[in-house]
């Protein structure tokens, strides 16, 4: 069922909280892979199916009619994020005039339904649990941090300084090669303004940033 309101979406998300991947997959008649080595997107697909996500294209939000993006957040036993969170691919060409206000990153992060999930590898995939959903919109300070990082990184892209981009740049968001291997090639702008072959780059939220979102939710949650 495709949720028609935010309340319906949250209700559906709350109804699967506490289930294991195996329980939910059996309910939806979806086979469970032995692990995620060859099926990295399986958990996201499982939750999209369970919640009725509509986006056929990754350029849109998962629940575009509600203005909501769905993000899974693998956490360890202490409740800390295990990995960075992919947001969107960076526009390496045809990016002149692009501003934070109309960027894909801002669009994707304007309203997020976070689904924390058990991510520790010693737990068999079928036995990992789904956590309580978190509806999140960036605070003014978080938006400032995201905008600052985005502008700094986009400046390097637009000026043809791709070779100067490292994962260390950015307070809460970083740029990293996106792709299962280094054979994925796309077009970018070189230092002299020429079109060059380069690796696709993706914007990723740092673990410290998503940990802050988790902690804020836990602090406001009634006991």
UniProtKB/Swiss-Prot annotation:
- What does the record give under GO molecular function? DNA binding; endonuclease activity
Gene Ontology annotations of biological process type: DNA modification; mismatch repair
Provide the transmembrane region boundaries. Answer: none
Q: Which Gene3D superfamilies did the record assign?
A: DNA mismatch repair MutH/Restriction endonuclease, type II
Localization terms from the record = Cytoplasm
Protein origin, superkingdom: Bacteria
What is a single cellular component term in the Gene Ontology annotation? cytoplasm
Q: Which Pfam families match?
A: MutH
Q: Which UniProt keywords apply?
A: Cytoplasm, DNA damage, DNA repair, Endonuclease, Hydrolase, Nuclease
| HAMAP family found in the cross-reference section | MutH
Tell me the protein family, please.
Belongs to the MutH family.
Q: What does this protein do?
A: Sequence-specific endonuclease that cleaves unmethylated GATC sequences. It is involved in DNA mismatch repair.
> Under which name does UniProt file this protein?
DNA mismatch repair protein MutH
């Amino acid at each position: 069922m495709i949720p028609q309101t935010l309340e319906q979406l949250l209700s559906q998300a709350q109804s699967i909280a506490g289930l294991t991947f195996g329980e939910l997959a059996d309910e939806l008649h979806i086979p469970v892979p032995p692990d995620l080595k060859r099926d990295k997107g399986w958990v996201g697909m499982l939750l999209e199916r369970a919640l009725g996500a509509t986006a056929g294209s990754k350029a849109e939000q998962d629940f575009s009619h509600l203005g909501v993006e769905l993000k899974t957040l693998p956490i360890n036993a202490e409740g800390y994020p295990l990995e960075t969170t992919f947001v969107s691919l960076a526009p390496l060409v045809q990016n002149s005039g692009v501003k934070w206000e109309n960027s894909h990153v801002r669009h994707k992060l304007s309203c997020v339904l976070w689904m924390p999930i058990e991510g520790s590898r010693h737990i068999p995939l079928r036995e990992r649990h789904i956590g309580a959903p978190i509806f999140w919109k960036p605070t003014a300070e978080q938006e400032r941090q995201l905008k600052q990082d985005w502008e700094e990184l986009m400046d390097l892209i637009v000026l043809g300084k791709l070779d100067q981009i490292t994962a260390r740049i950015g307070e809460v968001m970083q740029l990293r090669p996106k792709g299962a291997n280094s054979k994925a090639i796309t077009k970018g702008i070189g230092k002299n303004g020429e079109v060059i072959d380069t690796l696709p780059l993706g914007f990723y939220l740092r673990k410290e940033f998503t940990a802050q979102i988790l902690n804020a939710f836990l602090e406001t949650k009634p006991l």
